[in-house]
Amino acid sequence: MNLTQDQAESLANATNALSNENAAMAKQVGEALKRYGALGQVAGLTAKQTAAMAATLIGAGAEAEVAATGMNAFMRTMTKGGSMTDLQKAAFGNLGFDAKQLQKEVQKDAPKAIFSVLEAIKNKLPKELQMQYLTAMFGEEGARAMGPMIANIEKLRENFALVADETKYAGSREKEFAARAKTTSNALT
């Protein structure tokens, strides 16, 4: 992901804070980042936004590998533009999106584009068509990971907000270490 030492430290603190706010361990989020992080940045997400997305997916029940593969399929499709298949273009078009415009929007503001697509699927389609559209748009791998995201849009929004404000997570690893060091079991060893 080509991060400086300070950026890596900040990402580690953000990942730790995300693990404290989600049913995802920092190790799992880190594994998803290792698999997908660099591609997320190419697709328009920051490393911390990618971590937030991974934490949301893992918290919704996805394994780290499934989360990484699903994010890859999801973001790769969103950045295809005119290279989308006819089926993908039709599915996005039915929801009011133009493939080339969406490609530009992802690069301009990836979280906004992600929310607009997820909310369109959730709000414009009956539940029985949502997985069908997710599969048509993002393939089996993308649909498998992103299906649970539809039900967790607000959690994703909270996670993006958390990583957007470094004051919310700065030093979180050190604080957690200090808290654990004060426990009775640690004091006895």
Pin down the residues of each PLM region.
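Alpha-helical architecture feature
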Residues: 1-21, 28-38, 46-189
